[in-house]
């Protein structure tokens, strides 16, 4: 899922000059206030900021107005126009070298809270692109998709887990407009995936954080048509929605309550949460109980069940002592090697075999994520290799791939209420080359887990759009999980 604001089909004619159809450079919707600044060059010439405008939903914004738009959602499938004022509109087929630089921040990924009522520090997303583009009338057509999977064997009462997927697995294709929401669910059904359906609300709900009646009708019609079952509703807390300050505790509560109500409206029994602030959880517990929702904090790489931050969450849970609280186990935490998808990506970015090998050696050590990342960047600089050529991969390689032992999940098994069956590849032998699925299945079967395993393909963080069909991979992963859990059951 390339981290770009523009694609090969982005350049359009506009009455005021030229326009660039922008793509949101992330996997979920963001507030327009998440955009700090955008600058453009055309054929090497810098465009003055006063000659740039953004058009979204019938409104026009100056670049310096964008950080103020905390009430305006840039939905993942929207492509606002960045209008560049020129003396004349270009002709169709006219070629130009377009450079674009965008600085964004991710409002739900807080590095440090603000002090004295000021804004906190948030994870940035920096985009730098330079592409040769030709003027087009509109976006490229989506490619035809081929069904290559035979019908799956039916689920049985003896299967310990129910299978499903998070629609996040098709993030890149959904963002590109290859599917609308209905079409995505139809494709899932066509491939025999399910019955569990999980969503990230900020990705799929156009009126986020509110679930509209129109979305509810679409949702119910698809579920009735295909016999799906709602498994997990992914909630974020957009603490940095405003640029001048963080959310207040009351705003955090109200925002979360809106999401919980949306989850209930869609029929979800469980909400995946990413904030475990004790006071916020204490206020939200009565809401969850009233709405009959389970709350599950996600344990994700680089952490595991016994990492220090997770131990603090476990202590908070013990203090609150509520049956509503649990965990989502994300298998990015328990990988035995780096994914081939990532290794292909860093090779495309220019790393040679020596650098790729050194990256894997550093990853396998027991140093902290930050220490490993800094050691690798130091190695690159020592070889006069620019870490910037890797973009976000220099960080994601160590942040998204954890190497905790699968057996550690047993330490919290009674509190695990949902599973993200994270994966990146399925090889020719039907195995995940970086994650030991037979061992994970054994740990969870023997630990007594009996909930959903929700497939989550996160290869889109590293793969190019169209490099693989993620939903075909999900079907193949389901075959692996199904075979593994039935083998364990047969051995008991």
What residue spans do the PLM features occupy?
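Terminal leader/tail segments of proteins
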Residues: 1-145
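Boundary/entry segment of secreted carbohydrate-active catalytic domains
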Residues: 146-180, 234-237
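Active-site acidic/histidine proton-transfer and metal-coordination neighborhood
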Residues: 147-152, 225, 229, 239-331, ...
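Hydrophobic faces of well-ordered beta-strands that scaffold small-molecule active sites
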Residues: 161-167, 195-199, 230-235, 271-273, ...
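Active-site mouth loops of central-metabolism enzymes
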Residues: 166-181, 239-253, 274, 400, ...
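Gly/Pro-rich active-site loop or hairpin
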Residues: 174-181, 210, 306, 310, ...
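Catalytic domains of carbohydrate-active enzymes, especially glycoside hydrolases
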Residues: 179-202, 261-270
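Glycine-rich, proline-tolerant flexible connector loops at the mouths of alpha/beta enzymes
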Residues: 195-220, 460
């Amino acid at each position: 899922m390339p981290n770009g604001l523009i694609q090969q089909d982005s350049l359009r004619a506009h009455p005021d000059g030229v326009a660039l159809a922008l793509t949101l450079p992330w996997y979920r919707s963001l507030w327009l206030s998440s955009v700090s600044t955008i600058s453009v060059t055309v054929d090497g010439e810098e465009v003055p900021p006063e000659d740039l405008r953004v058009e979204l939903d019938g409104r026009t914004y100056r670049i310096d107005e964008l950080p103020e738009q905390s009430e305006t959602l840039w939905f993942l499938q929207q492509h606002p126009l960045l209008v560049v004022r020129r003396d004349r509109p270009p002709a169709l087929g006219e070629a130009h070298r377009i450079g674009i630089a965008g600085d964004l921040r991710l409002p739900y990924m807080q590095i440090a809270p603000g002090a004295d009522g000021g804004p906190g520090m948030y994870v940035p997303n920096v985009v730098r692109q330079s592409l040769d583009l030709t003027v087009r009338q509109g976006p490229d057509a989506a490619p035809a998709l081929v069904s290559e999977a035979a019908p799956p064997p039916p689920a049985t009462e003896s299967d310990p887990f129910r299978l499903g997927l998070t629609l996040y697995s098709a993030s890149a294709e959904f963002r590109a407009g290859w599917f609308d929401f209905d079409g995505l669910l139809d494709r899932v059904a066509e491939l025999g995936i399910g019955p569990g359906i999980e969503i990230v609300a900020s990705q799929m709900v156009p009126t986020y954080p509110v679930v509209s009646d129109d979305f509810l009708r679409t949702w119910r019609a698809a579920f009735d048509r295909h016999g799906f079952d709602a498994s997990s509703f992914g909630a974020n807390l957009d603490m940095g929605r405003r640029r001048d300050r963080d959310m207040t505790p009351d705003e955090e509560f109200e925002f979360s309550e809106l999401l919980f109500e949306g989850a209930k409206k869609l029929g979800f029994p469980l909400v995946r949460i990413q904030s475990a602030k004790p006071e916020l959880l204490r206020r939200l517990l009565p809401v969850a109980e009233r709405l009959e929702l389970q709350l599950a904090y996600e344990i994700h790489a680089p952490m595991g069940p016994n990492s220090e931050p997770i131990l603090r969450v476990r202590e908070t849970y013990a203090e609150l002592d509520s049956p509503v609280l649990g965990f989502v186990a994300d298998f990015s935490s328990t990988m035995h090697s780096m994914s081939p998808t990532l290794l292909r990506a860093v090779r495309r970015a220019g790393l040679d075999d020596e650098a790729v090998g050194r990256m894997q050696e550093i990853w396998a050590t027991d140093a902290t994520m930050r220490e490993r990342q800094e050691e690798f960047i130091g190695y690159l600089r020592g070889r006069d290799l620019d870490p910037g050529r890797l973009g976000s991969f220099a960080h994601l390689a160590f942040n998204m791939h954890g190497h905790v032992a699968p057996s550690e999940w047993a330490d919290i098994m009674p509190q695990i209420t949902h599973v993200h069956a994270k994966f990146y590849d399925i090889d020719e032998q039907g195995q995940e080359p970086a994650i030991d699925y037979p061992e994970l299945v054994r740990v969870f079967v023997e630990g007594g887990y009996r909930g959903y395993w929700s497939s989550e393909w996160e290869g889109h963080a590293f793969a190019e759009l169209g490099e693989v069909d993620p939903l075909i991979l999900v079907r193949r992963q389901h075959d692996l999980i199904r075979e593994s859990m039935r083998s364990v059951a047969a051995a008991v």
